């Protein structure tokens, strides 16, 4: 049974003009994600940050709470399997989580499907 579906589109370029990037990055990325982010350079770093931001937005929509008091960025962690497929490895949902990320030059679109009962 589908519990929820969340979709988000984010403009990658907006992450290039953050007023306080260090604070924002610490808010959005878990320590494990931050370690991976630090290894990225240039456009790839912006794509990574925008992608993780967007996945967490999509997850919060699928979960039904949005990001805020009940769910925050640190409650959700994304990593990748051996072939680069994204997976959400830390989250409050007890069922199965499906995630997809796609980038263009200027945008990232993500979808999260939560399957099962919570």
UniProtKB/Swiss-Prot annotation:
The lineage of its organism: Bacteria, Bacillati, Bacillota, Bacilli, Lactobacillales. One of its GO terms (cellular component) is cytosol. InterPro entries: 4-PPantetheinyl_Trfase_dom, 4-PPantetheinyl_Trfase_dom_sf, ACPS, P-Pant_transferase_sf, Ppantetheine-prot_Trfase_dom. Pfam families: ACPS. GO terms for biological process: fatty acid biosynthetic process; lysine biosynthetic process via aminoadipic acid. Belongs to the P-Pant transferase superfamily. AcpS family. One of its GO terms (molecular function) is holo-[acyl-carrier-protein] synthase activity. Mg(2+) binds at residues 8, 57. Keywords: Cytoplasm, Fatty acid biosynthesis, Fatty acid metabolism, Lipid biosynthesis, Lipid metabolism, Magnesium, Metal-binding, Transferase. Transfers the 4'-phosphopantetheine moiety from coenzyme A to a Ser of acyl-carrier-protein. Gene3D superfamilies: 4'-phosphopantetheinyl transferase domain. Signal peptide: none annotated. NCBIfam families: acpS, pantethn_trn. It catalyses: apo-[ACP] + CoA = holo-[ACP] + adenosine 3',5'-bisphosphate + H(+). This is Holo-[acyl-carrier-protein] synthase. Coiled coil: none annotated.
């Amino acid at each position: 049974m589908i519990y929820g579906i969340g979709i988000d589109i984010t403009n990658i370029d907006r992450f290039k003009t953050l007023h306080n990037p260090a604070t924002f990055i610490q808010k959005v990325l878990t320590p494990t994600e931050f370690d991976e982010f630090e290894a990225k350079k240039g456009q790839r770093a912006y794509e990574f940050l925008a992608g993780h931001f967007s996945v967490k937005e999509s997850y919060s929509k699928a979960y039904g709470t949005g990001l805020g008091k009940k769910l925050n960025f640190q409650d959700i962690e994304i990593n990748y399997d051996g072939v680069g497929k994204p997976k959400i490895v830390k989250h409050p949902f007890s069922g199965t989580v499906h995630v997809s990320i796609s980038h263009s030059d200027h945008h990232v679109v993500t979808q999260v499907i939560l399957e099962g009962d919570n």
